[in-house]
């Protein structure tokens, strides 16, 4: 039900293999497995860096009740997002964000929604701190309630929603966040390169844009654009994507949330 409709009947099950709410393609904080490289420019002090990012995570369904693709699901989400300074001799770890929470998703026809309560904590790398004596650390952690409403129409998808910090450190952080975006999926076709060797291998062009705006950052719009090719097999929910990426806005990771950056790069993404 992530990528195509099903005519199946009513059923309930534990540990479903997919979700009634499709994961957001262009959200930088979507729990997933990926590795990427970005040429990053700090817009405040005009410095440049080659940044490597890796992520591990997924939404794991505990229980679902469905009629075809319609229904609801509850599960567990967990994610790790780490950034590395590739210009340093040891490719030092800059920052890691840890996310864990409970998502509740629902679908009826073209409409779907995801509501989740999750915790995030951020931690700077040891080598990063050792090389910068006196660095002003911020112990950033929070719990947020988030809701996203999505609508699918043929090859397009629109979504919008937001979040509210129910608890946060520092306690002075403003609480409200808005989020919206769109996704486009082109026609799926046989893979022209590997399709002759691997029967059933398909490719789909994809494009997504995610926008976020935070009360804490005076509602400045942060933009993330991804586009590329997705590989899949008939009958499988697993996806392999090679995506180009452009980001403009405040840093989406860790205690650097007040740093204005611009980045361009590419990455490999696995949807399990």
Regions found by a protein language model. Give the residues of each.
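Outer-membrane beta-barrel "beta-signal"
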Residues: 225, 259-272
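Solvent-exposed loop/turn segments connecting transmembrane beta-strands
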Residues: 45-52, 88-90, 166-175, 212-223, ...
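Alpha-helical membrane segments in multi-pass integral membrane proteins
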Residues: 174-185, 197-212, 223-225
């Amino acid at each position: 039900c992530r990528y195509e409709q099903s005519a199946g009947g009513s059923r309930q099950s534990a540990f479903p293999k997919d979700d009634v709410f499709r994961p957001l393609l262009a959200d930088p904080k979507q729990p997933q497995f990926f590795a990427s490289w970005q040429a990053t420019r700090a817009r405040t002090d005009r410095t440049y860096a080659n940044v490597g990012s890796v992520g591990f995570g997924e939404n794991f369904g505990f229980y679902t009740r469905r009629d075809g693709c319609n229904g609801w699901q509850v599960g567990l989400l967990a994610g790790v997002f780490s950034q590395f300074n590739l210009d340093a001799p040891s490719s030092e770890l800059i920052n890691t964000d840890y996310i864990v929470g409970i998502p509740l998703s629902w679908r009826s026809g073209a409409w779907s929604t995801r509501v989740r309560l999750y915790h995030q904590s951020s931690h700077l790398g040891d080598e990063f701190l050792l090389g910068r004596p006196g660095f002003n650390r911020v112990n950033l952690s929070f719990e947020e309630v988030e809701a996203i409403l999505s609508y699918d129409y043929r090859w397009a998808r629109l979504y919008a929603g937001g979040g509210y910090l129910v608890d946060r450190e520092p306690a002075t952080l403003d609480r409200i966040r808005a989020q919206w975006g769109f996704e486009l999926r082109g026609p799926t076709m046989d893979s022209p390169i590997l399709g002759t060797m691997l029967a059933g291998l398909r490719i789909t062009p994809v494009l997504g844009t995610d926008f976020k705006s935070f009360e804490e950052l005076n509602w400045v719009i942060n933009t993330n654009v991804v586009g590329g090719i997705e590989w899949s097999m008939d009958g499988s929910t697993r996806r392999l994507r090679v995506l180009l990426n452009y980001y403009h806005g405040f840093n989406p990771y860790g205690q650097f949330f007040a740093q204005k950056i611009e980045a361009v790069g590419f990455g490999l993404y696995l949807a399990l």
